[in-house]
Every structure is written in structure tokens, then in C-alpha cells.
Amino acid sequence: MNSPSIHTIAPQNEQALLQRAQSLAGYNLAELADIALLPLPANLKRDKGWIGILLERFLGASAGSKPEQDFPEIGVELKTIPIDEQGKPLETTFVCVAPLTGNSGVTWESSHVRHKLARVLWIPVEGSRHIPLGERRIGTPLIWSPNDEEEEQLRCDWEELMDLIVLGRVESITARHGEVLQLRPKAANSRALTEAIGEFGQPILTLPRGFYLKKTFTAPLLARHFMQLSN
């Protein structure tokens, strides 16, 4: 098994990416931070994206914060997912920022959500709060695409949520909307407002929103993966 090393060049194919990710499995965050010369924060309250930034150094991600996938050369998105001792996800998974204006004629097929979730490298990371950040270990990665059933679930939720946005009802959307995909505010502070459409078609200011995968979607996805590993 390869030991972790920093990669500044993007992987040429999925197999190369998966090998890089597999080389991280079993290492804890402090060990990887030492190799990457990246300071380990006390916690993730102010550094929510820190684990992703750390892992990108070992994987050779090139997209940064652009709207395209993390590995645009091979069409793969990176998602880290905190898990408990049973391998179950501890929180929802951010997909992308939701467009609140200019949505006439937008379709699921051309949406950012579908583009981001077309091919995903999932990297589980221990996330239980009683484990100090530096001692949390990286799990075995998987590369995934939604099957027909998952794609249909995502499409139905996306269409329902986008209909509400277009109809000027963005502020009536709660985290309970959607079976597997939810829309909720994404802002570090409540002063970061963005333009949206109001109930009567008028421009309004509201908090930016993001699409998130619910745990009811990611839990069975991970369960299948861990089951395959144990067989």
C-alpha cells in the first residue's frame, strides 16, 4: 500500500485518484497535517472546510472553490463525510449553493446538483465529538454514482425545491422539505444576504441557501459500501 504523499498534479484517471485516497485510510488527521505542513485547528467550528483542504493536498484537487467538480479533468467531486463508530453519517452533506434567481427554463439534467453528484469520491472520517480532532482517522474511500432509484429521488426533491424558489416561496422552505435533498440557509453570519424572488415576483433579500444531502440518503449508501468491505 502506498504511503500518503502530497500531490500537486491532478490524477489522470479514477483509479489513480482512488489509489491516492486509499493511501490515506487508517491515518489520523494529525499525522496527515504533519506531512502536509498544515496547522491543526483546535476544532472545526471556524474551520469547517479544513478536512477537505487537507485531503485535497494529498489527492491533487485542482478546482478549489469553483462551481465545477473538484477533479474536473476526470469529472469527480470530493465529499468528506463524518461518521460514528457504526459507520453512520453524523451530519448532512453540502452539495452546492442554490441559485435563487435566473431559474427560468432550468432543468434537473443541466443543474449544478446533478453535475456535482454525477460521480463522487466519498471519504469517511471519524467524527464523534469525544475523539480529539487530531486523533480522528480516515476511512476507506469509495467512488460512487447515483443508481436509477437514487437519481429519481434526487430529481424529485430538486424539482420540488426549485419550483418553490421560482414561485417566490423560498422563505417558506424548511429542512423538512424533500425526502433526500434539503435546502437550508448557508451563511457564516445573518448579514450576508443575497437577492431572491418574493411571493409577488418582487426582488427580496434573503440568506443564501445551499442544497444538502440528508442522512437518510447517505446512510444506506455508506452501509452498502461497508458491507461490501466486510464480505
From Swiss-Prot:
Entries under HAMAP family matching the protein: MutH
Keywords: Cytoplasm, DNA damage, DNA repair, Endonuclease, Hydrolase, Nuclease
Tagged with keyword Nuclease: yes
Main location class: cytoplasm
Origin species: Pectobacterium atrosepticum (strain SCRI 1043 / ATCC BAA-672)
Protein name: DNA mismatch repair protein MutH
UniProt record similarity statement: Belongs to the MutH family.
Gene3D superfamilies cross-referenced by the UniProt entry: DNA mismatch repair MutH/Restriction endonuclease, type II (3.40.600.10)
An annotated GO cellular component: cytoplasm
One biological process term in Gene Ontology: DNA modification
InterPro entries, A to Z: DNA_mismatch_repair_MutH, DNA_rep_MutH/RE_typeII_Sau3AI, DNA_rep_MutH/T2_RE_sf, Restrct_endonuc-II-like
The keyword NAD is annotated on this UniProt entry: no
One MF annotation (Gene Ontology) recorded for this entry: DNA binding
Compartment(s) where it occurs, according to its Swiss-Prot or TrEMBL record: Cytoplasm
Function recorded in the entry: Sequence-specific endonuclease that cleaves unmethylated GATC sequences. It is involved in DNA mismatch repair.
